[in-house]
Amino acid sequence: MSADDAPARLGDDRAQRSVVRRRAAFAVLTLVVLAGTVWYGVSELQRARAEQSAPSQVDVADGILDAPHVLFRSTAPGDLYGHAAAVALDDLSGPREVTSVVCDRVSSDGTTTVCLRTDRGVVTTYEAEVLDAAWRTTATWPLPGIPSRARLSPDGLVATTAFVTGHSYSQTGFSTETTVHRVDGTDVSGNLEDFTLLADGERVAPVDRNVWGVTFVDARHFYATVQSRSLGHTWLVRGDLEERTLVTVLDGVECPSLSPDGTRLAFKHDAAPAGSATAHWTPAVLDLASLEVTVLDAEERNVDDQITWLDDATLLYGLARDDEPETTDVWSLPADGTAPPEVAIPQAWSPSVVR
Amino acid sequence: MSGLVRAVPGDAGQPIRTAPEATPQTPEPRPPRRPDAARRRAGRVPSTVVTLGVVSFLTDVSSEAVTAILPLYVTAALGLSVVAYGVVDGLVQGAGALVRVAGGWVSDRTDRPKWVAAVGYGLSALTRVGLLFATGLPAIASLVVTDRVGKGVRTAPRDALIAAAANPRNLGRSFGVHRALDTAGAALGPLLAFAVLWAIPDGWTTIFVISLGAAVLGVGALVLLVPDLRPRQAAWLRAHRTRQDRGLPKCKGCTCDAPGAAALTAGGRPFSWSFLRGGATVRLLLVAGVLGLLTVGDGFVYLALQDRDGFATQWFPLLYVGTNAVYMLLAAPAGRLADRLGRARVLVWGHALLAGAYVCAAAPFSGAATTVTALVLLGAFYATTDGVLSALTSALVPTAVRGTAIGTAQTVTAVARMAASAGFGVLWYATGRVDALWIAAGALLVAVPVCAYLVRGGRLEPAAPAEETTA
């Protein structure tokens, strides 16, 4: 080639040295990052092993499941974390009977129990399980995503809500899948999103509708939430399993829960100022006869749970602890909002009242 | 001259030095020197492309590990509902698309794609530090948004870097190799995250630490190992120095000889939006838009499969891993195929595979066979379209506007696909899932031949300067 090759080669040499230096720097960086990550991972693994095998610090008693009780998911750290457990209805903060069943959400009527769980592994799957009074499995079916709500009706119907989540940048958001099964595992409804949605008598079909939070009225009717962000509504709907319809009742009602006497619905009311990106949910009660809403702002924290009625005058719901988020407490609040909330069952989640 | 060569070290030197062999209009026969070596080099994917693939691999391990467990983290560890998380996700879809064009534009204007990409990768890496300390949903939401902005910024300059480093003849294969590595990271990340949660039930922080480590290594690999390619400057050098080397007058009927040095420091031909007026570019964007409008999200295919049979429900969380695995395996071969048969042709006919996936999801045969076939077709669809689109675009437009053009083509596709998903959702509820899928498959089977006609006869293959006539 020509004479100007020489300076070019000189430049090449210098560039070559720079490349070697950069490669060495990258090798050092790799070593540092790997060593740091592995060290942290191993120490966390040891800590987790120690915590998991440590006995849970809870008072344990027998025979609670034979009397009226509240069944829940125990969130006391230690070897019993995540197990379904029960406390006596007349001594909520007292000792608990712990079962061998592990659940994310649990709902029970005393003879039948529904347990939604995450089967962790390299392949994480989710399932719903129905158990009989002796805690034997009678039916299971797969869930498409993270278990969120479970409700069992006295008529042998099971409503489950799972979050089907986006997994990649290209996917659009999330969706819920809410279905109703019979306790023997047969599918009654399919995805409730496929029911005909009637808003003020008109059939509407917003693309982004999601259905969740079923509460049963009887063997055929239920209440639930239907949300469509594009339409800007979060409706309370009354569903009909035979007609396969969802009829809107009221806007702004989320995650309803029917009172034992069937006259009121407890729900999450979004008290965040209009236009804010995130919701702030406050418990509220709707009188079904007058459609009058009482917002229970004695509870100032953000409550994200499907509320349960302890009795006709008291609500129960779970809240994570600020300082130890894996541990939750079940709180109680008078349904008329006249007194502040207090801890009903410490270290518990997903309460279900069995009378 | 040495200073100029140093500005484009390593692989960047390759195109310049090999330019006499690769420049098409060369009237003389090829220099007889080392023809075998040259051919072998042309068949190989440049190390810069592989390094960029490794950068993407690490970054995808980092981001997908977090993305996969974020809903669980928000619900299980923070005690919030995923409904709240959905809000976050919806907010950022549009913003990400616009940032893509901007990232390409800045990289073209500055002629520094590496550093624009580094800003994007760095931004995402910073959000991993944030995750270690974030506790509330607003904090996590803003981190997710920042991460997506980072992804938007880096994509177009990164693809411009690949285009600059690759041999124009095997551009498709280079993009394919990059996408294979990228997708491997996207598949590995979630598996890694779930493996950690399996071993450490509350191992969120461990996942975030691993994610941070992978992101830091990704940025480190980019900054330390990828040469600072200056595509515009290199193109200028290629055009001018080679003519000089060949003893030709520096320019043929142009005036660029006079301001030589000034033009060099400015980085060659300046950026101009006029590429958007070029007939071929418009045609490409039109085809990408039309096909994008018929590409409904994979989410719908998965949901349809899951509605139909229990097999898909049980493995629902894994369906996308299957798709990604196929995509990963086929990306490089599909890119090679595109180089041979024509990139536009492969891009267009790849959408027939998507129609096949819809048919599998709509067909009344439930069970593992149709589910697996649908996943294979989806993966093959991505392999024949994603990297190929970038390869096609970067070969079609002048070097000076490559980043912007790639960003624009990707944005057109992304926005069209978003619209498709919204529209398909309406159809899904109006006609039921089976009919909706048949309609989408039918529309695709009409659109594909039409688009194939639009791009017939190599209409979207590059004009002379970028492609070897003998290829």
What are these regions (language model features)?
Chain A
Residues 2-355:
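Sequence signature of WD/YWTD-type beta-propeller architectures
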